[in-house]
Amino acid sequence: MSRFKRGAHVDSGAGFRQEKEDCPVPYGLLKAARKSGQLNLSGRGLTEVPASVWRLNLDTPQEAKQNVSFGAEDRWWEQTDLTKLLLSSNKLQSIPDDVKLLPALVVLDIHDNQLSSLPDSIGDLEQLQKLILSHNKLTELPSGVWRLTNLRCLHLQQNLIEQIPRDLGQLVNLDELDLSNNHLIDIPESLANLQNLVKLDLSCNKLKSLPPAISQMKNLRMLDCSRNQMESIPPVLAQMESLEQLYLRHNKLRYLPELPCCKTLKELHCGNNQIEVLEAEHLKHLNALSLLELRDNKVKSLPEEITLLQGLERLDLTNNDISSLPCGLGTLPKLKSLSLEGNPLRAIRRDLLTKGTGELLKYLRSRVQEPPNGGLKEEPKTAMTFPSQAKINVHAIKTLKTLDYSEKQDATIPDDVFDAVDGNPVANVNFSKNQLTAVPHRIVDLKDSLADINLGFNKLTTIPADFCHLKQLMHIDLRNNLLISLPMELEGLIKLRSVILSFNRFKSFPEVLYRIPSLETILISSNQVGGIDAVQMKTLSRLSTLDLSNNDIMQVPPELGNCTSLRALMLDGNPFRNPRAAILIKGTDAVLEYLRSRIPT
C-alpha cells in the first residue's frame, strides 16, 4: 500500500466511486499508472484534467469489481503512488485544487498549455523536485510554489511574468532555474540564497542590472543574461569561482567584464553589444577560456595580450571594425576556428582570408619571425636587463595604463618595476599574490593617475598614512592580508567607490570608512568585526553593497534599516540571534524592513 496518508482527502463514498466511463483518458493508461507510478497525458488535446487522474490513488479501480480474490494475479490493491505526471502540449487553462491529491509527485510537467494561474495548493506537493511550467500565460505564481523546498528544477520560460518575489530564496535546493522570455525588470537579491544553483537562465527579459549578491552563488556554472538591457556587469560577478559559461549577447555592454576569479570559465559569449576596446585586464585571467564570441560589436583592434588565452579554440570576431591582427594570434596552440567576416582587414590579402583558419594562423606565425619593423619581435635581454623588467608588460603600461606585477611571490616590489613606468600615466596597479609585508613606498609616484589598486593576497599588516596622497583612487582591494586597522588619513580619498577588506583581522569596523561619503561598496567579510555604527553608516548615502558576513557581530542595530540606499546587505555567518535566518534568506529588502520595525518609537 501507499506510504502516504490519504485520510484527509478521502470522502465517505470514495471506496465505492466508479471511474467515469466517458473519461477522455483510456482506462488502460490509468491502470498502468497505478503500477508504474508514471502517467503521460501529453499532446491529447485536453482542456481539463479528468478527476480520475487526481484521484488515481484514492478511488477503487474498476478491476476491483471484477476480481476480489486475494489470490488473483492482478493484485489491484498493491498500487504505486503516482510520482511522475506529464500534461504538456494540451489546452489546459487551469489546474484544480485537486492537484494536492497526488502528494507523492516528484515530477510535474505542464509546459505548452494555456495556463494563466496555478492553485496555491500546489505547495502541498512536498516531494516535488521538478516543475515545468514553460510556454504558458502565467503573469505571477502562487505563494504555494515557494513552499516547494525540495524543488531542484523550475522552468518558467516563455510566460508573462513581470516580477519574482523575494520568496524565491526559499527554494534552497534548486540547481536549475529558467526565467527566460518573460517581462522581468529586476531579480530579487534573495536569489543569492540559492547556493546549490548550477544553471540560471535570465535571457530575453528587460533587466538593466544584476543584484550584487549574485556573487554568493558559488556553485553556479552557467549564467545566461542574453537579450536584456544591461550596460554593465557588477564587479562582484568576478567572484563566481565555478562559472563555466557566461552568455551576455544582445545587451548594451561597452566593455568585457573583468573576471579575475573565474578561473574555470570556458565560454564567454558577448556578441551583439557595443564593445569597442579589448584590454589586457579583461583577458589575462581567462586562462581556461576555450570560446570567446564577440561578433557584431565595434572592436577596432586586438591587443597582443590575446596570446594569453592559451586554451582558446574558437574566436568569433565577425562584423567588427578590425583593420589588422596581432601576429601573435597565430601562436595560440589550440585555436581551430577564427571568424573574421565583415571586418575591414587591409593588412591581410583577401584570398588568404578565404583559405580558412589553418592557413591564416600559419601566415600570422610566419610574420612573428620578421624584423622589429613589424613591431612584434621582442628586444633581446642584455646584461643590463633586470630580472623584474623581463616580467613586466611594458605594452600594457603604455597602452592600457596597467602596471601588473602579480603572482610573483616576491617580498618586495623592485624599484625597476616602477622605473618601467617611465612617466606614463598608470590607472591600474596589480601587486596581488605576492609576499608583501609593506606597501611599496613608491606607489605615491603614481598619485596623479592611479584609480585602481589590488594588493590582495599578501602579508600586509598596515596601510601607510601617505596612501592618502592617491587622490584619484576609486577602487582598493586589500583582501587576504593581516590588517587590523586603517589610517584615518584615508578620509582624503574623496573619489573612493569600493574597498575590499575580506579575510583580514579587523576586530572593529574601520572608523575612517564612515568618513568617505563616496563609498558605494564595502566588503569586509570573514574578519572578527564585533559591531557597526548604524547612525554613521547612514551618512554613506551612496552605499549600495555592504558585506559583513562571517564576523563576530552579536547584535544588529535596528537603525541599520534606515540605510535605504543598500541594495545588497550580507550578514550571514554572525552569532547574532536576530534577524533570524528565516528573515535573512528573504533578502536585503526584507532584512531592512525587519530592522526598521524594531526601531523603538
UniProtKB/Swiss-Prot annotation:
Gene Ontology BP term (one): intracellular signal transduction
LRR repeats: 33-56, 79-101, 102-124, 125-148, 150-170, 171-193, 194-217, 219-239, 240-264, 266-285, 286-308, 309-334, 336-355, 397-420, 423-446, 447-469, 470-492, 493-516, 518-539, 540-563, 565-586
Keywords in alphabetical order: Leucine-rich repeat, Repeat
PANTHER family assigned: PTHR48051, RAS SUPPRESSOR PROTEIN 1 (PTHR48051:SF1)
Name listed for the protein in its UniProt record: Leucine-rich repeat-containing protein 40
